Swiss-Prot record:
A GO CC annotation given for this chain: cytosol
Organism of derivation: Homo sapiens (Human)
Gene responsible for this protein: CCZ1
UniProt modified residues of type N-acetylalanine: 2
GO biological process, one term: vesicle-mediated transport
Residue numbers carrying Phosphoserine: 76, 266
GO MF annotation terms: guanyl-nucleotide exchange factor activity
Family assignment from sequence similarity: Belongs to the CCZ1 family.
Role according to the record: Acts in concert with MON1A, as a guanine exchange factor (GEF) for RAB7, promotes the exchange of GDP to GTP, converting it from an inactive GDP-bound form into an active GTP-bound form.
InterPro entries to which the protein is assigned, alphabetical: Ccz1 (IPR013176), CCZ1/INTU/HSP4_longin_1 (IPR043987), CCZ1/INTU/HSP4_longin_3 (IPR043989), CCZ1/INTU_longin_2 (IPR043988)
Keywords recorded for this protein, A-Z: Acetylation, Guanine-nucleotide releasing factor, Lysosome, Membrane, Phosphoprotein
Subcellular location: Lysosome membrane
Designated name of the protein: Vacuolar fusion protein CCZ1 homolog
Predominant cellular place of this UniProt entry's protein: membrane
Subunit structure: Interacts with MON1A. Found in a complex with RMC1, CCZ1, MON1A and MON1B.
Amino acid sequence: MAAAAAGAGSGPWAAQEKQFPPALLSFFIYNPRFGPREGQEENKILFYHPNEVEKNEKIRNVGLCEAIVQFTRTFSPSKPAKSLHTQKNRQFFNEPEENFWMVMVVRNPIIEKQSKDGKPVIEYQEEELLDKVYSSVLRQCYSMYKLFNGTFLKAMEDGGVKLLKERLEKFFHRYLQTLHLQSCDLLDIFGGISFFPLDKMTYLKIQSFINRMEESLNIVKYTAFLYNDQLIWSGLEQDDMRILYKYLTTSLFPRHIEPELAGRDSPIRAEMPGNLQHYGRFLTGPLNLNDPDAKCRFPKIFVNTDDTYEELHLIVYKAMSAAVCFMIDASVHPTLDFCRRLDSIVGPQLTVLASDICEQFNINKRMSGSEKEPQFKFIYFNHMNLAEKSTVHMRKTPSVSLTSVHPDLMKILGDINSDFTRVDEDEEIIVKAMSDYWVVGKKSDRRELYVILNQKNANLIEVNEEVKKLCATQFNNIFFLD
């Protein structure tokens, strides 16, 4: 067990300070093999943001990154450069496929103070950015690109460098606008999945529903079922599901919240055969099934890219708080008739199922009792099944990460996680922050638990007891080493 003091208060100068969060300065992708000779350097650059940057500066920046990678390769041939720290910014490197390099340059947070003569003084917060967080964000950029476009190599095989450049431009031009670097934290490192807690009977109902749907709609290859933005069941491989889950919960679902709230009180189609009301609708695909000219276009996704390399249509269908993803082979083109059939089969059953889940969830909530606000917040992650649970985050979307704790405490959580990465053994770290909060990190059997306690008069022994109590109540079926 290790104990330490960390964190800083806001200080007397806070009122005169202006704070600027980290910001994306540039993002580029290059392949050194594409322009090996002098005068061909521009050919190496496959994508560069911002595009307005002058050509020679782009070539210079890419050349510098190449030199850094080559230099660090002499010390670590298999794992060259990961990040480069400077006073004003930090550069992150990732080689997702052989010779394809992605680089993200992030400006360090800035504090602007007034000097005695009234002139602004800029201070760069060099130690505020956590390498692990932003390296994870860069890896996510590739994973999200790969989900919708396949690998870089696939684009090269399909249409050479020209097609790859087009795909990179089309995807990253939009995707980089959704990167809100000030909201990135420990959850980005984990890239986990929040699972919805269910009793056995309701879980069996969902399993039965999925089996019936896959049988009725026999072209469905994989299915995933979510409720309240939390996963209940998935037929995909873990790594494919984690990135699809991120897309659904931070991009697709938030875009459809407004229309859902507006139409919540009345079924979308009240007149159904057999008088079954249903609230089902497509989140991808046709907007209006009654329009004979409605387009049945669904986004394509690529899964199992290391193995069988499958290209699929992604059909996302939602009723109330329940969403089901049907994935069908891309060689099959869904017609309007198929969409109407899916709507008539899935809609009523999913509506009933969503009501059942909601009812069961409320019963379980009442049985557990409405306790007063606990004196602790926690983040839990299981590396084996990617399960993630956080009471620190009230809401996590790309544009905002509403955390109920101070950023200083989030930074300590990240520092503890970095310490955990350096050792393979199970361990526990306890930190007393300057703000009098206690922060505890436990790593045991490929699981990690981070607890923030608001008990300033507690000592180490009492803090340890509180964490044991938390483990007993919140994680009673999970074994944490003492």
